[in-house]
Amino acid sequence: MTIGSFRDSYTSLGFNAFSLELDFATGGKTGDGSFASGYGYPILGVGLTYNTLSDVKFRSKNGHYSDMITAYGTISRDLLRTKRLGFGYNIQLGLSYSSGYYDAQTNSANWFFSSPVLLYAGGGGHLTWIVSPRLDLEAGIMVKHNSSARLAYPNGGLNYWGGGLSARYRFSSSRPPRANVFKTQAVRNLEKGWSYEIYAGGGVHACAAEWRALVKTVPRDELSTSLLRKWPMASLSFDAIYRTGGRFALGATVDGFWNSNTERLEWADRILYSEEEVEASKGYSPLSAGIGFVQEVFYRNAALYVQEGIYLYRHMGIRGEHGPLYERAGIRYYPPSLSPFFISVCIKAHKFKADYLDFTLGIRL
């Protein structure tokens, strides 16, 4: 159970947070070569957080938040552990719900998110006092983010930070060995070497330029997020990855993308910019291609997937939709019963701003 206080980055006014988690403490024998020992025996869990966001007052009268409920998964790992103290980091991912989202008439100042269901990510550090074999007291600091992930617009994103105190009761008195916090080991029964993967994906995108054009052309009393269309996106990729036999794999990728909104983007550019600027641009093509570096970090049959790429071909009007670089980050799952197939979900972004959520299905060759 955690009680915390946070501040959002826009109003700088505080609100409170209350969390409840159910955690699983991974274990194993010293030197067993398991995933748990390979990661220093992390704590995995699920939780619920209630944020009193309605306490935050906007500078504009036509703006407000509502209280938010978040369901998330979490991983917590100690980097340093003694008999009485532990110090480490926490990572949380999940979904949030809030009824106080953007509305052109009643909540126009809240341009941070435009849908009731939001993506959530958080990370931070903790200091733990081991009071007894079954009781821990913990102080921590977290940085958190919520956004509509381009499923709706406007989507400035809500960023907030703060700290809290928590108490953890353990149903078992057993604890991981202190000697293995830094001396993590390779995981047995995993083959080293190259693997090759092909995967295809798709998602839905809401265009920021289209929204700016609507704001400029539609009367305020008629402006609504329902006017903003959701555009299908698709991707096809090939990865060549080398796995070390333990937690990590590193490689290269070739990507192809299809955007369905190029005609609408050209319409928006002709409203936002001059005809001369539009005609001088590189044009508008639904197809783009790029290459990049990828890394996977494994835990059992799941992996955290991160990619940094550069476009070799992309014609998306005046602004080029954020430049030549792009990022993808998400989670992959390799179900043993469906081998060699895998599934994944990732966020595609430009300059670390979300473009769309990509759901993929792939095969390992």
Go through the PLM ranges and name each one.
Residues K29-S37, F171-S195:
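Outer-membrane beta-barrel biogenesis signature
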Residues T2-S19, K57-Y65, A206-S237:
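Surface-exposed strand-loop-strand hairpins of Gram-negative outer-membrane beta-barrel proteins
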Residues L44-V46, Y89-L93, G123-G125, L137-I141, ...:
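Membrane-embedded beta-strand positions of outer-membrane beta-barrel proteins
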Residues L22, N159-N180, I331, A354-L365:
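Outer-membrane beta-barrel "beta-signal"
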Residues G14-L20, G40, G63-A71, L85, ...:
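Residues that define the transmembrane beta-barrel architecture of outer-membrane proteins
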Residues S5-Y10, V56-N62, G100-S108, A149-G156, ...:
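Outer-membrane beta-barrel translocator domains and adjoining extracellular loop/strand segments
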Residues G31-G33, K83-F87, W129-L137, S173-P177, ...:
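Repeated loop/turn-to-beta-strand initiation elements of outer-membrane beta-barrel proteins
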Residues M1-I3, T26, L48-S54, L93-Y101, ...:
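Transmembrane beta-strands of outer-membrane beta-barrel pores
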